């Protein structure tokens, strides 16, 4: 094998690695969601705010939910499906009251959140999030109806290393396209 053909082979290998890395970057990025896209977690003016909001997002492992609220006025708890349905705030899975609650999504499943403050849940300050795939159970447990389902406890943690945005997705997509085009051009020149 001559030096020239070895160089061409190396270029093709490097380009293939770049394409694979570009595709993997998109898979490992995560998104930080501000719950409800609102300024604060609280009793909603529209009763369907927290039931509509998760339907417009695809949550995956590695994403995070950020609940913002005045700590002297509100709180956040994770509850079981039956407690979500009945607005029972006793014996929560997890309780936070720091006003800047970050919840990392660490496994697939359905999660149930509400305020620990009396009466807030019955005023629709509650959120059901399906991680991994859309769930018919999420639809069934919207404020108008409910059914029991398994609950998954997740741990809180630090802010994710990267926050996926439409700009980063576009950049990754553009990088992959350019790398693929270059690889095709090099392979075509070799042939």
UniProtKB/Swiss-Prot annotation:
The UniProt record lists the keyword Cell inner membrane: no
One Pfam match: Cu_bind_like
Alphabetized UniProt keyword annotations: Cell membrane, Disulfide bond, Glycoprotein, GPI-anchor, Lipoprotein, Membrane, Signal
SUPFAM superfamilies documented for this protein: Cupredoxins
Lipid group attachment sites (GPI-anchor amidated serine): 165
Residues that carry a glycan: 104, 108
Leader peptide range in chain numbering: 1-22
Positions of the pro-segment in this chain: 166-191
Main location: membrane
Membrane topology category: Lipid-anchor; GPI-anchor
Residue ranges constituting the Phytocyanin domain according to the UniProt record: 31-133
GO molecular function, one term: electron transfer activity
Recorded GO CC terms: plasma membrane; side of membrane
PANTHER family noted in UniProt: BLUE COPPER PROTEIN, EARLY NODULIN-LIKE PROTEIN 8
Function recorded in the entry: May act as a carbohydrate transporter.
UniProt name for this protein: Early nodulin-like protein 8
Source organism per UniProt: Arabidopsis thaliana (Mouse-ear cress)
């Amino acid at each position: 094998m001559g030096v020239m053909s070895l160089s061409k082979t190396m270029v093709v290998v490097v380009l293939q690695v770049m394409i694979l890395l570009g595709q993997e970057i998109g898979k490992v990025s995560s998104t930080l969601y501000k719950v409800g896209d609102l300024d604060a977690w609280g009793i909603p003016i529209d009763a369907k705010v927290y039931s509509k909001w998760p339907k417009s997002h695809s949550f995956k492992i590695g994403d995070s939910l950020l609940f913002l609220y005045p700590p002297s006025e509100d709180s956040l708890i994770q509850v079981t499906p039956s407690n979500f349905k009945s607005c029972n705030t006793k014996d929560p899975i997890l309780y936070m009251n720091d006003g800047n609650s970050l919840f990392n999504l660490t496994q697939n499943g359905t999660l149930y959140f509400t305020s620990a403050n009396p009466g807030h849940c019955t005023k629709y300050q509650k959120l059901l999030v399906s991680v991994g795939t859309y769930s018919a159970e999420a639809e069934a447990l919207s404020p108008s109806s409910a059914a029991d389902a398994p609950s998954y406890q997740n741990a809180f943690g630090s802010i994710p290393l990267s926050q996926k945005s439409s700009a980063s997705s576009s950049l990754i997509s553009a990088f992959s396209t350019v790398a693929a085009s270059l690889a095709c051009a090099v392979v075509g020149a070799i042939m």
